[in-house]
């Protein structure tokens, strides 16, 4: 399985599959879709209206990685379950944090 992130010079991009109204805010590990593309499974308690679930996702990622919430932005998938997030910072350091958090 491939990894759900792509490294760039000053950031990484993270593929996420978000479940809104998920009962609790949590990152549930890495999975692959039918085409074999990896994504991070995430769920939030926020409802999918007016960007609330997207904001909750970005806050969850920032808290989980212990980075400023301003470092996380949505690249694509505003109204879709599959999203691409941009996380600003040293990509190698961010990957280490993701790997530690996801165990």
From Swiss-Prot:
Family annotation (SUPFAM superfamilies): YggU-like
Short name of any one Pfam family annotated for the protein: DUF167
Protein origin, superkingdom: Bacteria
Family matches, as SMART domains: DUF167
InterPro entries linked to this entry: DUF167, YggU-like_sf
Family, similarity comment: Belongs to the UPF0235 family.
Full protein name: UPF0235 protein RL4503
Classification lineage: Bacteria, Pseudomonadati, Pseudomonadota, Alphaproteobacteria, Hyphomicrobiales
């Amino acid at each position: 399985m491939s990894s759900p992130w792509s490294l760039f010079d000053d950031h990484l991009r993270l593929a996420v599959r978000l479940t809104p109204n998920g009962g609790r805010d949590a990152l549930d590990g890495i999975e692959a879709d039918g085409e074999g593309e990896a994504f991070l499974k995430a769920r939030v308690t926020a409802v999918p209206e007016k960007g609330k679930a997207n904001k909750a996702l970005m806050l969850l990622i920032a808290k989980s990685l212990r980075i400023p919430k301003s470092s996380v932005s949505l690249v694509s998938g505003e109204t879709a379950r599959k999203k691409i997030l941009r996380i600003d910072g040293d990509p190698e350091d961010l990957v280490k944090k993701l790997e530690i958090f996801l165990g």
